[in-house]
Amino acid sequence: MSKPAAAAPSDPSKPSKPLKEVPGSYGLPVLGAVKDRLDFYWFQGDTEFFRIRMEQHKSTVFRVNYSPGPPGYPDSRGIILLDQKSFSVLLDNSKVDKSDTLLGPYIPNLAFTGGYRVLPYLDTSEAKHTAYKDLIFELLHVNSSRIIPEYNKVFAETAGSWEERIAKSGKAEVFASSDSMITKFLLRTIVHKDPAEPGPASLGPKFRDTYQLWTGVNFAGIAHTPLPHFLEELLFHTFRLPPFLVKKQYKALANFYRTHATEVLDLAEKKYGLDREETVHQLILILGINARLGLHKMIPALIYYLGLLGEDFQAKIAAEVRSAVHKNRAQGEEGVNITTQALLEMPLLRSTVLETLRLTPSIFYIYGRAREDMVIESHDAAFQIKKGELLGGHQYFVMRDPEVFEEPHKFVADRFLGERGKAVLPYLVWSNGRETESPSSSNKQCPAKDVAELITMQFVAEMFLRYDSFEITKDSFINTTELNVHLKSLKKRSV
């Protein structure tokens, strides 16, 4: 039986555990950071890097140099939190400052975002954080009727391309194709324009490449690539790449939004008093990084786990999907059979999606700086933290905390069903906030959390309205840095 009560946070002013010094060392200046970076990216890998130190210090809280670090990046010294209890402080905006901590110790050159600090780098105390988050909430509301139909269309296009590739070469890759699908979906839904459609400011058929190149150079400091390690280290992790490398791509993105997102820009300017040009750059990152990468990474992970579970489990999901859709069949637009109500009546599918998010969240790291001196408790100790110290959590470990989750490393599709599921639901964090909490303009939780879950559920529902089952290739794999998944077969729906 799960033990969620063991992870309940206590009053930090009255620690119930023995107070200890935070273990760990940063090593020699610069050299210590370089050693940790080489271990992190090369010699050990990101999960082993933390696992080895957790065992060495016999603690889930310890000091570490975050990567990439000096000499080319700022001071990377911080404290890692690898259990549910200590990690909870990162979700408390009264305790941690999120200014410029999206990537931990550094923020990319602002030239990558038109010279503006965009929403993910803003703390909840900043007025623009509230204004831009309220704008996103309104965009989701006014476009709510477009979400399911637009997703249905892009799914049909993508599924057709998968079928063609399997027929031609025996397999279809999922990562890049789902990225293109999600990018199209977001821009059609929010901007009301297909990025590949010919015309003024079109991004053309290689719109994904434009976004991907800008993303890659922007976040090169934390990149994992297929390059030989010494090249990756030299090119990306030692010094920052200059923004001019993607000036052309970023200009194309900005022109697309200036030209086609006029309704959004009007709303931002007239209702929220936001600068029109700044909003262009906010949209590029909010839609192109936060929303795009968040939604896109869920798809290969879901296909992978559903593929491993096999045909019998897929049949259960298919039956649930088809029953709920039949009961709540949509009226109106031809070909769109799914409704929001139907999705809400698919509990096994929802649990499967949440379990995927537990094991493979879109972002594994959350950071923040202590607003004041405080005491943080883990399951077995308490630690004094100084104001300004950089705190980070790695969700690979937090979402596998054995004090909370039964068989924490195993994919359990029905984990979040029934009373057992209800008990552990508050400890699921994938959206920069707890599953049982709601995003607001005063917190850092993803504003589209609930919509993102429904969209991801819709993806699986679309799969089983079109197919009876599917298989993945034997060499498919996923981990914290790669989602290498290929479809081997798609068995068309028989009834």
Curated annotation (Swiss-Prot):
The coenzyme or cofactor needed here is: heme
InterPro entries per record: Cyt_P450 (IPR001128), Cyt_P450_E_grp-IV (IPR002403), Cyt_P450_sf (IPR036396)
Reactions catalysed = (13S)-hydroperoxy-(9Z,11E)-octadecadienoate = etheroleate + H2O; (13S)-hydroperoxy-(9Z,11E,15Z)-octadecatrienoate = etherolenate + H2O
Binding of heme, residues: C446
EC annotation? 4.2.1.183
Pathway given for this chain reads: Lipid metabolism; oxylipin biosynthesis
Q: Which UniProt keywords apply?
A: Fatty acid biosynthesis, Fatty acid metabolism, Heme, Iron, Lipid biosynthesis, Lipid metabolism, Lyase, Metal-binding, Oxylipin biosynthesis
Top-level taxon in the UniProt lineage? Eukaryota
GO MF term (any one): oxidoreductase activity, acting on paired donors, with incorporation or reduction of molecular oxygen
Task: Give one GO biological process term.
Answer: oxylipin biosynthetic process
Q: Which SUPFAM superfamilies match?
A: Cytochrome P450
Record carries keyword Iron: yes
What is known about what this protein does?
Divinyl ether synthase involved in oxylipin biosynthesis. Catalyzes the conversion of (13S)-hydroperoxy-(9Z,11E)-octadecadienoate (13-HPOD) to etheroleate and (13S)-hydroperoxy-(9Z,11E,15Z)-octadecatrienoate (13-HPOT) to etherolenate. Has no activity with the corresponding 9-hydroperoxides (9-HPOD and 9-HPOT).
Family according to the record:
Belongs to the cytochrome P450 family.
Q: What is the protein name for this chain?
A: Divinyl ether synthase CYP74M3
**Organism, per UniProt?**
Selaginella moellendorffii (Spikemoss)
Q: Which gene encodes it?
A: CYP74M3
